[in-house]
Amino acid sequence: MHVLLVEDHRASREQLERCLTRRDYDVATARDLQTGIDFLNRQRFDAIIADIALPDGTGYALISEARLRGIRALCIAVSGYPYPSDVDEQGMTGFHYHLKKPVNCDHLCSLLKESRASEGDASTKV
């Protein structure tokens, strides 16, 4: 499974990358929105994991861009601030799941293993 991980916080990005690569996921990492979009232009991903707050935009913008391009990857938001308003906005932009930081590696990998992007709009789960 090919995963795009977009996270600006270095320690969180490295922790998530280690978590995924140890379980044999192929991971591309980006530190900001623009780099994430650049990856979307060049590669196909089965899943996108994006921080909500990025230095040059938001995870919402990344997922919106992916959906505009017809990308139907599983989309997981990660954030230190899982407020109900965040969940509402995620449902509108195509996130399937929202995970609070620090992300539990086993839980994340179980979502990746069990879930697939659905046809049509995603329903958000917390």
PLM regions with names:
Residues 103-116, 120, 124:
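C-terminal output helix
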Residues 10-28:
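Two-component/phosphorelay signaling modules centered on CheY-like receiver
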Residues 32, 58-61:
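Acidic catalytic/metal-coordinating carboxylates
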Residues 29-47:
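Acidic, metal-coordinating helix/loop segments flanking the phosphotransfer/catalytic sites
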Residues 7:
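Conserved acidic carboxylate
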Residues 60-72:
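Short amphipathic alpha-helix used as the core "switch/output" element in two-component signaling
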Residues 61, 81-99, 110:
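Alpha4 helix (beta4-alpha4-beta5 surface) of REC/receiver domains from two-component response regulators
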